Structure formats: structure tokens, C-alpha cells
Amino acid sequence: VTNPVGDSIEKDLMRRDLTINAIAVNIRTGEIIDISGGVTDIRNKCINYVNELNFVDDPLRLLRVYRFQALYGFSLAPETINAVCKYSDLIHKPAVERINYEILKLFSGEYAHIALENMNKTWILEEIFPFVKELKQVPPNSHHHLDLFHHSIETVKQVQNLYSEASDEVKEHLNRVDFGGFSRLAHLKLAAFMHDIGKFSTWTIEEGKHRFIKHDDVGAKMSVKILKDLHCSNKQIDYISSMIKYHIYPSHVMTSPQITEKIMMRYVRKMDKNSIDAIILAQADRLSAR
């Protein structure tokens, strides 16, 4: 429940960001007050703005378009896409802490991968994550059948799929809110999106083969500055950078020709509470690189 703005409920609703959030109920009569077509948009599973100038009043609403798409999987109305493109250069005006919150809400959503794809179509994604420009320059190769940008989004999708298929114990672990007010799963999907950011700067081609030597170490170091710029906490930064640094480690352990209980226990001791998370990220990475 939010405090009303304006001298009538209708004026208040017209100041909201999206039609699906601009619906009220008269508690005395039970009448639904919907002056922007929000009920119809919910039925049609469509995200649309109430008034495009509301994006100017608070540009964070540009990001909220994709946060709600990540949550519900709804399509975006063409006029909303056009408005986001029109005002995308305003996205840096809100406080960084507010942007951080919306990003993690987005990655909390089941359909985060869809939202990321659509953010890319309106330039918002590169405004928030400049490293995306570098991801797009690495083409499909023997390591992944997609270009690096789409491989990264596919990895986010595969993390969500693995979570959906996981046991109750694993889901309980990933649902824990250990840092930043958001679940481990949300942070793991953000790490999945960033897991290969070190590849562009380590990219070489030798005898036709693409190599990315130590991209995991380089990416982990790069992520620290990116996450600090987003005002993430030290715990959030430690977790995400650790996932990036060790996203190949579980695969090396599991594919070792001489895997032993000692090797497995060394992995568990090293990764500690993040053992399951790293395994899921490594598996998602492999599933995204067929």
C-alpha cells in the first residue's frame, strides 16, 4: 500500500509507472478503479506505461519495465519499447542504490533472461553494464556455439532451469537471503551473466583456435570494480567475484581422470558454503555451450 499523490485516486493512478500497477479498489463498494487499462493488460500478459512522461519524472521506471517482465514473463507493448528507447539516456539519473535494487529484483525473477534480451534492444543494458559491448565482440567458437553475449544470457536461463529442477534442499539453500536483502539465486544469476567478462581482454586466436587463458581470474578482478560502481556490499562482491573466479573449477574436479574423495573434500573445503552454487554455475555454463 502506498500513500496517494494528488487530490483524487484517479490522479494518483495516472502518476504510476505501469498500467498493471495503476489499479485500485474502492473498499466500500468493491469497484475496481482502472483508468489506464491495467486489467486488460494483465489478462493479455502485456507490460505498458501509464504516461511516457512518468519516465522523465523518475527514470528508474525505465528499469522497472524489465524488472516486472523478469518477474511475470509478460510481453512489452510496442509503445513502451519506443518510450524506453526515447528516454534511455536518463537511466543514470536515479541514485545508484536504487538502480542496484532494481537490478537484483530483475535477477530474482524467473524470466530474467527474457528481460535481459529485451533490455538489449533498447540500449538500457549497455548503459547499466558497459561490458556488454565487449561480450558482443566475441563470436561463436569451439568453446560456445553462441556469441559470448548470448552465451551469457543462456547461462542465466540455465541457472534458473537447474534451480527449478533441483531438490528441495538445494532450493532452500539458494533461496536463503545471506547478503544484500536478496536470495543467493538472484546473485548467482547475476554472476552467471558476468561469468565470462574476462574473455574479451584475454582473447587470442592461435592456429584458428580461440583461447581465453585465465579469463576466470581476470573476470573476477574486473567484477570487483563493476560491482563497487553499483554500490554492492562487500559480501555481495565477495560472493559474485568468487563465483566468477571459480566457475570452471567444479568442471575440472568432476572431469578429473583420477578423481578421489580427497579431491572432492578439497573442493568442499575451498568453496565452503558456495560449493553447491559453483557446481550449478559450472553446469549451467556447460549446458549453454553445446
Task: Write out the residue ranges for each language-model feature.
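Catalytic cores of the polymerase beta-like nucleotidyltransferase superfamily
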Residues: 1-290
